[in-house]
Amino acid sequence: MSQEKASSPSGKMDGEKPVDASEEKRKEGGKKKSKDGGGDGGRAELNPWPEYINTRLDMYNKLKAEHDSILAEKAAKDSKPIKVTLPDGKQVDAESWKTTPYQIACGISQGLADNTVVAKVNKVVWDLDRPLETDCTLELLKFEDEEAQAVYWHSSAHIMGEAMERVYGGCLCYGPPIENGFYYDMYLEEGGVSSNDFSSLETLCKKIIKEKQTFERLEVKKETLLEMFKYNKFKCRILNEKVNTPTTTVYRCGPLIDLCRGPHVRHTGKIKTLKIHKNSSTYWEGKADMETLQRIYGISFPDPKLLKEWEKFQEEAKNRDHRKIGRDQELYFFHELSPGSCFFLPKGAYIYNTLMEFIRSEYRKRGFQEVVTPNIFNSRLWMTSGHWQHYSENMFSFEVEKEQFALKPMNCPGHCLMFDHRPRSWRELPLRLADFGVLHRNELSGALTGLTRVRRFQQDDAHIFCAMEQIEDEIKGCLDFLRTVYSVFGFSFKLNLSTRPEKFLGDIEIWNQAEKQLENSLNEFGEKWELNPGDGAFYGPKIDIQIKDAIGRYHQCATIQLDFQLPIRFNLTYVSHDGDDKKRPVIVHRAILGSVERMIAILTENYGGKWPFWLSPRQVMVVPVGPTCDEYAQKVRQQFHDAKFMADTDLDPGCTLNKKIRNAQLAQYNFILVVGEKEKASGTVNIRTRDNKVHGERTVEETVRRLQQLKQTRSKQAEEEF
């Protein structure tokens, strides 16, 4: 990495003149033809640039000059000594409106300064070159930190946004960081984006990175910004609909100026490698009746090695894609006549039902009672619960006898009716109601993605109605439940406690008491957990659980959420032990698998189609050595079928024995039972596994018994343990 010198209070790098490529380009008058891109059938850089770029830049430069003058005056008049506290408790002397986080980082070590992506001042992310304003705490975040990654990818999105304006000339919309990388949406009057354009876009991005364009932050009045962005109706919508303050911020890099809260990296040169890898179309703010936008996705890293690792990871993820494996293994499919609703074929249905049986077996041990509730409810139910006001767009609704009804998108309101259908006593609490009811959510067709984003699904949904003082024990039970299930799957997980948000409903004392009980439960649970302050729902604190799959991806499936508001909305009460008949229960919303469909997608990709024996839709393949053993092979298969195994036979006369065994291994049959004349005479089978481990000859009865044991214990390595 290049060594950089400390910045001056203005944010410029001492001894290094920031490159303003846009000014140089404008001086050229657009007479030189761009050499970037276009040679592979894709688009090339526009020449000249769209007029709005020059107009916007002229306006910005005037505002920036005024801002710099005001800042210099403020630094001269109002600057005073301040104390900056570092994470180790050490305090550093600084000057308000002059000293920047970057200067402090340089004072510690140049290596630290070079590797810092962004600062965190008083727990808020902050530009490295933005002067500090008062006494504060300071953290210096490297790329490994999640918040730093978000900033790094956000800055990369601006680089790509600049390239998109210079290539397409359209109107930029939103360009956020996402879980792995970033995207930018653009509205084009004509035409669209092609993957053939990626090369010219990447070439231009590399040029922008090489220029080390400084990221500049500027606070501007809303009405001025409406004038600056009058060419772009989408930015004007954001200003009019989302900005409720007199001023907001824009950021500039080169000729790009965009509405943005920031912060950003110091300059574009901090992005060491950038790849554009995907494009799609979408609607403005996801609404099907709004304009169609072009979306381009990218990824970037501070080290080319990380990009190579990412590309390798993408290839592995592609090979594990549940949609491909589902097709290849004949587990499930989708059809245009019912978008977002999966058709589970017999072998896929086996996985689905086995997962539900697993959860049901745990319900019996843990005191849950399974219920069945309606699929369709009058809209009055959803008005009472509050979902109609906030969620009706995502519900399938229709008229019945002049009244509005809807398919249920969740089970909790129906469970509230169950609790309320007769008087309840403290003796009945905790009441644990479980429901595998079918749910429907009206997802946009463009958002539907295999089994991970569907319209029709089922959850291992449960609601615990309990007294306030029972919360701690119930949460302990929920945590133990999820550990039991996830250990069977081989998932590790991480836990976050999300506490009271700024805009919460209810009594603060109830919140404090509940949060304390959640903390106690987590501490006793014994697994590492982190506090996520202020990130709870408005109606109660929650525990967020993320599982980690075989290739290192995290997925949120389980839910443990306290709810103080739904019992109030439905006026749920019980008679307490001291005779108070207005006592209010607390609801614990709880799921372990979450959506069964989504969990099947995760498990498919986690195992790469190599299902563990207990869950496998192809547990046993019986292979006869020749046609004279076909009848015996069918008899053996029937014995395994009767013992409730997923068993098949390969009677194909056109295949050799070795070919049949290889086919069974490729189809991921856990156990392959070869039968010849010897086995036929002695009532035995010769056992090998899909990984070609040979277990030798056993009687059919002995084999059935052993496989039943392995199935009942849900062994992760049944083939080895046999």
Swiss-Prot record:
One of its GO terms (biological process) is threonyl-tRNA aminoacylation. Gene3D superfamilies: 3.10.20.30, Anticodon-binding domain, Bira Bifunctional Protein, Domain 2, Threonyl-trna Synthetase, Chain A, domain 2. The modification Phosphotyrosine is found at Y297. Its main location: cytoplasm. It is an enzyme of class 6 (ligase). Pfam families: HGTP_anticodon, TGS, tRNA-synt_2b, tRNA_SAD. The modification Phosphothreonine is found at T245, T452. GO terms for molecular function: ATP binding; identical protein binding; threonine-tRNA ligase activity; zinc ion binding. ISGylated. Residues 1-10 have a biased composition (Polar residues). Keywords: Acetylation, Aminoacyl-tRNA synthetase, ATP-binding, Cytoplasm, Ligase, Nucleotide-binding, Phosphoprotein, Protein biosynthesis, Ubl conjugation. Changing H158A: Impairs post-transfer editing activity but no effect on aminoacylation activity. Residues 13-27 have a biased composition (Basic and acidic residues). Homodimer. Belongs to the class-II aminoacyl-tRNA synthetase family. This is Threonine--tRNA ligase 1, cytoplasmic. It comes from Mus musculus (Mouse). The gene is Tars1.
